[in-house]
């Protein structure tokens, strides 16, 4: 098909040209004396993205799912009780992992389209006077349903109950896109991945651990090997890794961290909200459809899950968008499979990018027999964006810029080139 594929799934996301160029490097010795310069760029940059002074970031060659496992196995023991809410496919998968590795999961089942049930969490934690619950799990942004939860409210529930449980947060599709405050929210383990707001290919699991969580590794009895933080801590102390790191992705990560710092986290968060509001205007005002998120307080600024009329299979809309218009939309998962499609609006994105998503989805819906007014989605989104001030992150900038700074023998955009 002529032209390029327009990728609007909620991860993997579009990769900026700068980041792609930064990853175009020849391989090098990851145990060379020069290698630690790369690590010294990455770890401080990640701390800024997590908004932490006290947390310790870790980078694994894995997906975000790998870091789910790392968070749990480095802090807990077989039979430990954890509190978790299930309100979407990814909150369900974390619960499933905890069950399979031998934890006692106290599950709060919620309607899909809602988020973490703060009052139920508060009641359960207050009633747990013996402190049998060792950790509380919270999915910050549930991509299956387009729902964002209030993590500060979970911390308040823990504090009001004077409960010592660890707070684990899935920030895979929120970090670097939606406001995330590791220190302010008292998070103990935060999990993310490279393929969302960090604007990289999949392949890096990102974890941030509090001092309290790191202390727990000394008593944790769950089996671990590949994800043992002791190995990472010992190797990272000298700028190295306990096994082969994903070198190309790490050079890309340096560049993406530069882009994030240049735009500014507050501006990035504002940009994602502004763009998401335009998409939501297209869905609700233009097309007259509903979002899976039940209330505005749950709306995600990185993904919108669009509910379809009865009798319409979302898979048909997604297939039509891809096969006819070369637009990739996200599918419904598990309980909502076939009932919706998802538009991802995170990472390196602007208004005109999203106009392509909206128009492609609209044409596909019309082709599948859904009665929407042609042009209504783009009109509604455009009206919102034209009449609201664009965040500074959408001011025209040099997207072809490439970092030139060097530390030691390493360029921040790739290994030093030695000319002979």
Regions found by a protein language model. Give the residues of each.
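A glycine-/small-polar-enriched, mobile loop at the entrance of the PLP active site in fold-type I
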Residues: 3-61, 65
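Conserved PLP-binding catalytic core of the aspartate aminotransferase-like
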Residues: 290-324
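Active-site C-terminal subdomain of aminotransferase-like
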Residues: 14-15, 195-282, 391
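PLP-dependent enzyme catalytic core of the Aspartate aminotransferase-like
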Residues: 2, 335, 339-420
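Conserved beta-loop-alpha segment that forms the PLP phosphate-binding cup at the N-terminus of a helix
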Residues: 55-83, 87, 91-96
